[in-house]
Amino acid sequence: MSGIVTRPVPLRSQDQLVREGLHPVLARVCAARGISRRGEVDDALSGLIPPSDLLNAERAAVLLADAIAAGKRMLIVADYDCDGATACALGMRALTAFGANVGYLVPNRFEFGYGLTPEIVVLAAKSKPDLLITVDNGIASVEGVEAARELGIEVIVTDHHLPGAELPRAAAIVNPNQAGCAFPSKSLAGVGVMFYVMLALRAELRKRGAFSGKEEPALADLLDLLALGTVADVVPLDFNNRVLVSQGLKRIRAGRMQEGVRALFAVAGRDPSRASGFDLGFLLGPRLNAAGRLSDMSLGIECLVTTDRGRALEIARQLDDLNRERRVIEADMQSQADELLAKLSVGDSCSISLYDPSWHQGVVGILAGRVKERHHRPTFAFAPGNSDEIRGSGRSIAGLHLRDALDLVAKRAPGLLVRFGGHAAAAGLTLRAADFTRFAEAFESVARQLLSPGQLARAVETDGSLEPAYLDLGLAQLLERQIWGQGFPQPLFCDEFEVLGQRVVGEKHTKLNLSRGGRTVEAMRFNALDSLPSRVRAAYRLSVNEFNGAQTLQLVIEHWEKTGT
């Protein structure tokens, strides 16, 4: 059962933000998210943390500049998700502009699995590279880097995943989460790390006079890729990431984007001039990810690197078809998961582990996320892998760091996990199929130790009541222009309403007419058909509804409770 709670607001911070000219509601919302001064809301690129603060970024830049000068062959080895694809495309665009001889390789997840493995090194060696550059992977590739070294191939690792006990012996490792790195933003996505390396490389090339007599490549032109990868990877939107995403969205809205990004907006039926974080995370990101989930992410990367508008649209349509196929597979898996969950005492457990031999390896992460959202339990979903192995993808709730939890499982049950890695909120692992039940029990034991009853109770966190006078289109438009996402959630308000009317629209949604404080407003409940009582307490967000060129205010109801009056 979910309960509505209100975020505390530091009044001193709120008052300071109002004095500095912020709208009173925006000031309250920002103060509740830890913002205390106007400068933390501004999005100027000049406010970014400098590349010199990122450990080994300058060392990587020197290695890359030397390789460019020597005409060495570079090969980017990418991860197969949206973050990896955008990081690869950004690197390809930037390095090509800098005069590098560069190509890319993305492992097929079904054949090779994740990361720079020795098998991938053998495959990469066919292109005769002098230098491998990992993007969004590599921090755990100890054996892969050794395999490359034995072949005389240098490796630069750019990654953001949490390091293990042993680091690969790469020529340079750039990762804000490695020991000794004082970079303040630990939440850079893989594409963000690669962007910073390219900034450092441009500075190094400038120092060497490489741009003498010609225009420097404008890395800001790649911020659309950076915004897409950052939002799609669901990394926390701290100040640095908000600046990067905001600047990327501004360029998209102004029509300054890669042809592939333009094409993805087209197949999603969205207007890029009104681009939002929602578009990047829920519409473009899934279409790119569909390539890595069901086919080969090379298709997604080609979409992002091509400069041919027609080719970009052709690929985007293929990605759209793959995404539709993914939805069908996901729906079938969800039905099967519901059958498995019906046999479990989910309410009495602290975790959920699910496995079905028919499940698709590329879709288990989405399934785990859906189950986690519905039941508010850290969840792993598994599908068959190679030979006698199964591969799982997990999603967690606040209070349980998923990678740390897996590390604890591995220490308590040596040999149980074949391999694992990830973040606080998401992780992946491989184990033997025969060990699934043993893993489920071990993970449950760890979750029971780490989670309190309070953390297992779902809470709908809101920004409190909104004065009726602020139920207007202007505020909805103001909030829509801000950057919201992981760690900096979109405002959700809570008030009591009288329900004047409700009807089903689009077969699975409900449209409502609500009244509060003498004001009548339209609202929507998506994917909900049950009728509301005459009075409700609702958690809602303001949205801008556009129809036939006219914009109106519309509330989106996220949660409701009966008021008792």
Kindly give the residue locations of the regions a language model identified.
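Active-site cavity-forming subdomains of large catalytic enzyme subunits
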Residues: 122-191, 195-211
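Hydrophobic helix-and-loop "lid/oligomerization" segment in the mid-to-C-terminal part
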Residues: 9-130, 151, 203-435, 465, ...
